[in-house]
């Protein structure tokens, strides 16, 4: 099918946080941690459609467990509904603190299908699953998943995920190549 059938990303929605907002949040984060005796230096900032991850490098002698136990205090200091702490960030010597964006942006499948990640994919059956925390399109190979379980709370995006998988199949193969029966018991 032509890509015109899919909606374009709203440009205003992609600008959910500007650099000044990031700097202000980063300063609040460092200040909040220092109030609890945790000295850190700010690292990279990864902006995704729904959350922004702030990488912080703890000073020598700071225990990671101490940062993990401050999640509610960090959320309070940043005026966020909640924060998630990834300690340590795999492959890096830092702690990631994920903060919800004030205005989450929608992830459109057209953005993923038009991306280099999709067009350059070596997957036998590529599926567009969304975007990573960093905002990078997430494309994976359905053939590498012998079993697939989609679960989550109400409103978490299970149906959207299934729709993305079906649309990925339709945009990757011709009608002669794709044959499936879908049953929705609802």
Language model feature labels by segment:
Residues 176-186:
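Switch/coupling segment of Walker-type NTPase motor domains
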Residues 168-178:
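Post-Walker A helix-loop "phosphate-sensing" segment adjacent to the P-loop in P-loop NTPases
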Residues 1-149, 161:
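N-terminal "pre-motor" subdomain/linker immediately upstream of P-loop NTPase catalytic cores
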Residues 157:
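Conserved glycine(s) of the Walker
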Residues 87, 152, 185:
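The Walker A (P-loop) glycine that initiates the GxxxxGKT/S ATP-binding motif of P-loop NTPases
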């Amino acid at each position: 099918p032509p890509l015109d059938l899919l909606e374009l990303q709203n440009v205003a929605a992609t600008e959910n946080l500007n650099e000044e907002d990031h700097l202000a949040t980063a300063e609040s984060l460092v200040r909040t941690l220092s109030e609890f005796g945790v000295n850190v230096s700010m690292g990279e900032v990864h902006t995704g459609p729904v959350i922004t991850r702030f990488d912080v490098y703890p000073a020598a002698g700071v225990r990671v467990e101490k940062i993990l136990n401050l999640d509610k205090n960090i959320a309070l200091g940043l005026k966020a509904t909640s924060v998630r702490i990834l300690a340590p960030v795999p492959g890096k010597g830092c702690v990631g603190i994920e903060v919800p964006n004030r205005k989450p942006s929608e992830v459109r499948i057209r953005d993923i299908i038009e991306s280099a990640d999709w067009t350059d994919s070596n997957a036998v059956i590529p599926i567009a699953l969304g975007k990573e925390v960093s905002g990078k399109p997430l494309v994976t190979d359905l053939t590498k998943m012998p079993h697939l379980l989609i679960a989550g709370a109400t409103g978490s995006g299970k149906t959207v995920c299934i729709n993305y998988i079906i649309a990925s199949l339709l945009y990757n193969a011709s009608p002669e190549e794709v044959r499936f029966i879908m049953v929705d018991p609802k």
